[in-house]
A protein has these predicted regions:
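Repeated loop/turn-to-beta-strand initiation elements of outer-membrane beta-barrel proteins
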Residues: 50, 84-89, 122-126, 163-171, ...
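Outer-membrane pore/translocation modules
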Residues: 95-188, 230
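Detector for outer-membrane/organellar transmembrane beta-barrel domains
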Residues: 36-38, 43-44, 48, 147-225, ...
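Glycine- and aromatic-enriched membrane insertion/assembly motifs of diderm outer-membrane
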Residues: 65-98, 110, 186-188, 197-200
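Outer-membrane beta-barrel biogenesis signature
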Residues: 22-59, 64-65
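Transmembrane beta-strands of outer-membrane beta-barrel pores
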Residues: 44-50, 91-97, 119, 134-138, ...
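Residues on the lipid-exposed face of transmembrane beta-strands in outer-membrane beta-barrel proteins
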Residues: 42-44, 75-79, 89, 113-117, ...
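Outer membrane beta-barrel transmembrane domains
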Residues: 53-55, 61-63, 195-279
C-alpha cells in the first residue's frame, strides 16, 4: 500500500475517537489492514455539556446549573486476518461526573468486537466494506455507564483517495444500524463522513473534517445529562482533526468537536488525543 493511502486510513481511524461518549463505533475505516498486521490505538477523550436540546430541539441549560463531564480511556485494536477479513475490538473505560449527582461513576462500559469484510475495491483506490459488531456490557447494576444490554450492529463503509489542490486526500462514508436487545432497547442509525488532506509531500502532517451523528429511537423518552443512558435522542456533530506521523508505525492525533444540533441530548463539546501503533 502506498504511504499516502496508508496514513489516510490511519487518520480516519483515530480522528473519530472523540465520539466515544455517545458510543459511536471506532470501526468505520474502509481501507484494509494487511494480513497479519496488528493495529493498536489507545486514546484519551473528554466530553463536556452544561446545556441540552429538549425533545422538541429547543436549547436550554441543565436544571439548577448542572454540568456533566466525562473522561474516557479506550483501547482499539484491529487485526488483518486476510485480504478480505479483519477483526476489530474496542474496550472503553469512562469516568463520569454530573455536578448534581451524589458521586461520580466510573468503570468499563461496552466491549465491541466485530468482523469486517471488504466487499470490493476499484483499482485499489476505492474500497467497500461491511462490518458486523457485537456489543457486550462489562458492568452490572450501574445505569450511569450504559444501557447494560447486549446488542449488534451492521455497518457499510465506502472509502477512497485522490488529490485536492495538488495534495493527497481521502474520504470515508459510513452508515450503520445498531439494535440493543433489552427492555426499550433502542434501535439506532449511526453515520459519519470524513474528508482528510495531507499537508506535505512526505505525509507527515494531515488535517481532516468530520460530520457524524446518531438517530436513536425507543419507547423510553426520558432524558439524562449522562449521555450513555439516553435511549431516544438524535444529534449532529462536527469535528476537526490533526495528525502527525513519526513513522509508518507510530502516529499521534488530536481532534475536537462540537454538537451542532440535537434532540433529547446534551450540547456536547469534545476533545481527544490518540496514539497509533502498528506491529
Amino acid at each position: 500500500m502506498k504511504p499516502g493511502k496508508y496514513l489516510f486510513r490511519v487518520l480516519f481511524l483515530t480522528v473519530i475517537l472523540f465520539t466515544t461518549f455517545q458510543n459511536l463505533s471506532y470501526a468505520d475505516g474502509g481501507f484494509p489492514v494487511r494480513p497479519g498486521r496488528l493495529l493498536i490505538s489507545p486514546s484519551v477523550s473528554y466530553f463536556f455539556a452544561n446545556s441540552e436540546w429538549d425533545s422538541t430541539g429547543v436549547k436550554k441549560p441543565f436544571p439548577n446549573g448542572g454540568k456533566f463531564s466525562s473522561i474516557g480511556v479506550t483501547l482499539y485494536t484491529e487485526y488483518g486476518i486476510s485480504r478480505r477479513f479483519a477483526f476489530v475490538a474496542t474496550l472503553p473505560y469512562v469516568y463520569n461526573n454530573y455536578s448534581l449527582a451524589t458521586a461520580p461513576s466510573s468503570g468499563l462500559t461496552d466491549l465491541e468486537t466485530g468482523i469486517r469484510y471488504y466487499l470490493a475495491n476499484i483499482n485499489f483506490v476505492y474500497y467497500f466494506s461491511l462490518q458486523g459488531t457485537a456489543i457486550t456490557p462489562l458492568y452490572t447494576n450501574n445505569a450511569s455507564l450504559g444501557y447494560g444490554e447486549e446488542g449488534a450492529e451492521l455497518k457499510l463503509a465506502f472509502s477512497g483517495s485522490g488529490h485536492l489542490f495538488g495534495e493527497s486526500s481521502y474520504f470515508n462514508l459510513a452508515d450503520g444500524v445498531r439494535q440493543y436487545f433489552g427492555t426499550d432497547g433502542p434501535i439506532q442509525n449511526r453515520f459519519n463522513g470524513t474528508f482528510g488532506l495531507s499537508l506535505d509531500k512526505k505525509f507527515m502532517n494531515q488535517i481532516s473534517v468530520t460530520l457524524s451523528g446518531i438517530n436513536s429511537f425507543s419507547n423510553n423518552k426520558s432524558f439524562s445529562p449522562i449521555p450513555q443512558t439516553d435511549k431516544d435522542f438524535s444529534f449532529l456533530q462536527a469535528s476537526i482533526g490533526y495528525g502527525h506521523s513519526f513513522s509508518h508505525e507510530v502516529s499521534l492525533f488530536l481532534s475536537g468537536g462540537q454538537f451542532l444540533t440535537g434532540r433529547n441530548t446534551g450540547v456536547g463539546t469534545t476533545a481527544s488525543l490518540a496514539l497509533y501503533l502498528q506491529a
